[in-house]
Amino acid sequence: MIEQLFRLLKKQGLGLEDTQITEAERLLKLAAVATKAAAVTLQLLQARDGQTDQAALVAFTPAEIDVLSAINATLEGKTAKQKNPHPLTSLAAATWIIARLGGWDGYASSRPPGPITLHRGLQAFAAIAHGFALGIDLAFRAGNVCIP
């Protein structure tokens, strides 16, 4: 587990060792943020097989879970083998979605997604979630949102 954490923090993941920050305090803050991001990736890695019953709320906000649900519909195929096999509110379901965004093909017969695939998926998800939030904000400003 520790080896995977360091792998995520270094070249193949967050590139922490390539930073040009020289001030100790700033470097410490960057390391803390990077470690949090790597820890989320490792949480997803542990949940990918659905052997834990953790809720997606341990790693994502309610708004992010809404975005994950919307993305899930676009990533699932037409056959049962191409569907997310986990309950949508579980961390395992979130892992399946994030892995698909990271380039995993979604088939159980394929090699399971690793930490780098999940890291790439989290990067893609962050961009999508940001765009989703901007879209909602713009709709509210324009008065185009009706809340029941």
Where are each of the predicted segments found?
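Single, function-defining residue in the core of a domain
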Residues: 1-148
